[in-house]
Amino acid sequence: MSRSLRKGPFVDHHLLKKVRDMNALEKKTPIKTWSRRSMITPEMIGHTFEVHNGRKFLTVFVSETMVGHKLGEFSPTRMFKSHPVKKG
């Protein structure tokens, strides 16, 4: 079930504050976050985030096509290693 339109997108307050502060100072340093649930908003375009995937931080550069998605969608948590090939 999707989120109600009257509520608007969810973005953690601390993350939104960091983005707004960096926009005011016109800085583009990477923002480290554990908030995979936060929605990408238009004011985040052009910023680089380091999103935690449970083990390490993966770098995500936000572009216009990512608006409306969540940060966690671009930081996969499961890595599939192929099944071994039987020799013989």
Swiss-Prot record:
InterPro entries attached to this UniProt entry: Ribosomal_uS19, Ribosomal_uS19_bac-type, Ribosomal_uS19_CS, Ribosomal_uS19_SF
Keywords from the UniProt entry: Ribonucleoprotein, Ribosomal protein, RNA-binding, rRNA-binding
Record Gene3D superfamilies: 30s Ribosomal Protein S19, Chain A
Molecular function, one GO term: rRNA binding
Source superkingdom: Bacteria
GO terms (BP aspect): ribosomal small subunit assembly; translation
A Pfam family recorded for this sequence: Ribosomal_S19
GO cellular component terms given for this protein: cytoplasm; small ribosomal subunit
Keyword rRNA-binding belongs to the record: yes
Role of this protein: Protein S19 forms a complex with S13 that binds strongly to the 16S ribosomal RNA.
HAMAP family xrefs: Ribosomal_uS19
Entry similarity comment: Belongs to the universal ribosomal protein uS19 family.
Protein name: Small ribosomal subunit protein uS19
